[in-house]
Amino acid sequence: MKIRTNLTRFAVPALCLLTLGAFHSNAQEKPNLPILDISQETDRQVIVANGDRVYQGHPTTLLLPNGQTMFCVWCINHGGAAGPMARSDDGGLTWTRLDDQLPEGFVTHQNCPSIYRIVDPKGKERLWVFSAALGKRGGPAMPSIMSEDSGKTWKEMPPLGKDFNCIMTWSSQIPLKDGSTLGMFHRGPGGADRSPLEVLQSVTKDGGLTWSKPEVVAKVEGKDPCEPFVLRSPDGTELCCLMRENKHKGRSLMMFSGDEGKNWSKPIDTPWGLTGDRHYGLQTEDGRWVIAFRDMAQNSPTWGHFVAWVGSYDDIRNGKPGQYRIKLLHSFAGRDCGYPGMELLRDETIVATTYVKYRKGKERHSVVSARFKLKEMDERIRQTEQPLR
């Protein structure tokens, strides 16, 4: 069945080279950049999956190279089973559910399915949806479904196995210069969801079919790094990894690599404005980064809501505040929101998608997108007479 969900109105709006290992005390924490609020602008919002009765959770998205076809996958209930998938052929304005076209076993894949496009060194494209475990939490690690025809058909693939025991599957992936792809994830002892957490990485050289044995790349005494998001510097020479800090006693964490992930610097604090959970972002045509996440910055007026940070790689690298933040969606369920998909369309529209309880009442979480352009946001900053940094 094809369901078309139109624009729907509803009411609701580092990396820092300080001294390595330097962290900030709570007393220092306060907003240090402008904050815009578009969370009440319902004409910007699209419902991908409505949570009238069912909790729709933890989406990720993928935009194909044609600039219009977008996929969204998510789980049922908080960290629950996979199964839902939707496709948009108009850049996220309307969506068609594909659940009944997927392998039967996909509904047995557990926790936060994540969709990626991996191109192997020979140029072969594959779409992948990885999840954390098969059958139940703690089951065989990282099962997946895969498509070799741009998402027209899918087949179930075997789990990657015990070396990949995880809390969540890959939080992010990035192509490397040699044509391989780096993937990053996190776990606790024995793969359990408990402290101390550590971040691991693995590399595929055949488009996702096989992966190297994972190695630990971030472990911080007294902190719990997790949910890594890796991005590349504008000159292409450096990787940066932003990480959630799960004790939530300070800022988020970041680290850098100048050799394609072979070695990483010691994790340090991000700028205040990048403090949050489950970072995911994109680079705009003018070179800036827009990174969305669940706001967990101390003393933030948008704490617990779905926000985006706007700034340059230099801001991240040198610990600067950035240009501004945007409150994208308001959560009516505390901090239970903010696992995002982020896509940039050819007309410069940014489509930021998350799970969120977007209204008061008995309704549960929905998968919702917020749409905006940086030019619009820049102009609003100018109107407040706050110069762009």
Where are the regions that the model predicts?
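Bacterial N-terminal signal peptides that target proteins for export
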Residues: 1-14
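Intrinsically disordered, low-complexity peptide-like regions
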Residues: 4, 22-24, 35
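N-terminal compositionally biased, intrinsically disordered segments and leader/signal-like regions
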Residues: 6-9, 20, 70, 205
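N-terminal leader/targeting segments
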Residues: 12-13, 20, 132
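Bacterial Sec-dependent signal peptides at the C-terminal "C-region" and cleavage site
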Residues: 18-31
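Asp-box/BNR beta-propeller blade signature and adjacent active/binding-site loops
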Residues: 28-389
